[in-house]
Amino acid sequence: EKSCLSACVILLAAGHKRRVRQGALVGLHRPYWRQASLEKYYEDHKEEESWDNVFAFSEWLHDDALLSLAEYLEFMLDQGVEPRFLLSSLRFRKMLMWYPDRDTLAAANLITPNETTVPDKETDASPHAEISMR
């Protein structure tokens, strides 16, 4: 299946010519932590971070999540991705993937307009070649 999901979308946005193969899926979701990952992170770091309880950890986690989100949004905006599109990608419940159509991706400037399709056999060997989603 041809797809670019989750963190791959950040790599796509970093490109100069952002093209996707016909029929490829581009999937976005909001950041999240699974409960088991949170528990492990807390147990592994509570002493070095001086978290006296899970509420201290929660305070740190909230702050860290907001800082990480700000960095992500700043990067995507610097790459020219439309703000409303980014907000839409954050409105989905955790672990749900959003698959916008090609027109939406182009209008949001996540894929380069007028260069949205990659031929099946790659002929462009330039350093600005697109991400191949296989």
Regions found by a protein language model. Give the residues of each.
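Glycine-rich beta-to-alpha active-site loop
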Residues: 1-40
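Charged, glycine-interspersed solvent-exposed loop segments at helix/strand-loop junctions
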Residues: 36-131
